[in-house]
């Protein structure tokens, strides 16, 4: 059986780095141990306690290989030119402009391309080849020359963002919709499925706060996005990121924020839900800043609410030691039970910061 390499450094390698970055890969690779039975290619040494912990939940002993033939698990890296095109924020920006979804989007390829911007409007400047949620900064009309030093760059109006959500589109056409939790710097902190058995926009917590006609327009836009990207030649799954924003007191949808042609944290959250959700419908994948507790202590702390196979209810500690974030999977019958579980988790770990609300 060929091993898998969790190449979470996918964008970095795709857009320039010639060598893999193990530290990035090791920050996420352990997630594969819970949802993929194949051996994991890794130079990291996992403790016997952690490997047994994974086995207790999956029923299979994880196999770690230091050297082996492998295939990439996060992003393909088999058709570099196509993958660069599909993952570039330039392609999504061009589609936003063409379809009139965000006319204040600007693709700046040199200092000669600086557009005339609205006075007082703040803009988000993105590296078109950066990792999702990274390599961005704020700019205004008056500081373009001093702020933007490298090109190309995508310039978009900074909107009053309220909630983030995505659709993951599988190769067979199936779409799953979920809410993403991000912090004030747009860094990913978790994914919530209110009903992973019916992962549609209608299940989003904020769905009914937005006009139905706006959702209809969004659905047409989503169909167009999928059509355009499929026509461009993609062969595997991809995510379409969107968000809700407030405009003069009215909630609206930014149809297309970006597209990620690779595995995503949202897809991982869905796969965890399928594996551990059972008859329960609400699930959440949660990241918190690494606590001062080691793995053993953290596992012991949350033992009163640890997930059990009999009921598929509770919390699973996913992360080992030596990682930047503690990661948890939460499974509950419904929102009421989920809120209670999260409350209990917070009380058991009072020093941890939980940005997720159910």
Annotate each language-model stretch with its function.
Residues 1-20:
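Nucleotide-activated donor-dependent transferases that construct or modify glycoconjugates
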Residues 21-120, 130-131, 140:
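Conserved N-proximal alpha/beta basic substrate-recognition cap immediately N-terminal to
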Residues 30-31, 37-41, 229, 262-304:
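Active-site "cap" helix and flanking loop/linker of ATP-utilizing ligase/carboxylase catalytic domains
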Residues 84-161, 170-173, 196-221:
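Active-site nucleotide/adenylate-binding loops and adjacent lid/helix of ATP-dependent enzymes
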Residues 139-191, 243-256:
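Phosphate-binding site of ATP-dependent enzymes
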Residues 167-224, 260-286:
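ATP-dependent carboxylate/phosphate-activation module, predominantly the ATP-grasp catalytic core
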Residues 188-252, 288-311:
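A long amphipathic alpha-helix within ATP-dependent nucleotide-binding catalytic cores
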Residues 278-358:
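Peripheral (often C-terminal) accessory segments that flank ATP-dependent C-N-forming ligase machineries
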């Amino acid at each position: 059986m060929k091993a898998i390499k969790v190449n979470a450094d996918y964008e970095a390698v795709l857009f320039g780095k010639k060598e893999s970055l193990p530290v990035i890969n090791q920050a996420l690779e352990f997630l594969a141990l819970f949802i993929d039975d194949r051996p994991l290619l890794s130079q990291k040494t996992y403790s016997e306690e952690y490997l047994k912990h994974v086995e207790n939940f999956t029923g299979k002993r994880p196999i770690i290989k230091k050297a082996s033939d492998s295939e990439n698990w996060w992003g393909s890296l088999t058709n570099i030119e196509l993958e660069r095109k599909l993952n570039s924020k330039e392609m999504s920006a061009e589609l936003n402009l063409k379809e009139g979804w965000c006319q204040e989007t600007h693709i700046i390829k040199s200092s000669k391309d600086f557009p005339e911007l609205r006075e007082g409007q703040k803009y988000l400047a993105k590296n078109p080849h950066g990792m999702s949620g990274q390599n961005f900064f704020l700019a205004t009309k008056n500081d373009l020359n001093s702020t933007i030093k490298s090109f190309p760059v995508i310039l978009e109006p900074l909107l009053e963002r309220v909630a983030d959500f995505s659709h993951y589109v599988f190769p067979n056409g199936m779409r799953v919709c979920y809410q993403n939790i991000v912090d004030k710097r747009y860094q990913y902190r978790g994914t919530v499925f209110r009903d992973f058995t019916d992962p549609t926009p209608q299940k989003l917590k904020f769905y009914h706060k937005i006009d139905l006609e706006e959702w209809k327009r969004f659905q047409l836009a989503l169909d167009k996005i999928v059509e355009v990207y499929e026509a461009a030649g993609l062969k595997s799954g991809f995510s379409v990121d969107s968000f809700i924003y407030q405009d003069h007191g009215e909630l609206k949808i930014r149809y297309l924020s970006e597209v990620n042609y690779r595995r995503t944290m949202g897809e991982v959250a869905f796969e965890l839900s399928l594996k551990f959700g059972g008859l329960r419908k609400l699930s959440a994948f949660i990241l918190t800043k690494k606590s001062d507790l080691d793995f053993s202590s953290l596992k012991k702390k949350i033992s009163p609410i640890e997930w059990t196979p009999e009921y598929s209810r509770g919390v699973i500690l996913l992360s080992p030691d030596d990682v930047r974030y503690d990661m948890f999977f939460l499974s509950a019958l419904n929102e009421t039970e989920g809120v209670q579980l999260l409350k209990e988790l917070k009380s058991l770990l009072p020093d941890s910061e939980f940005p997720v609300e159910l």
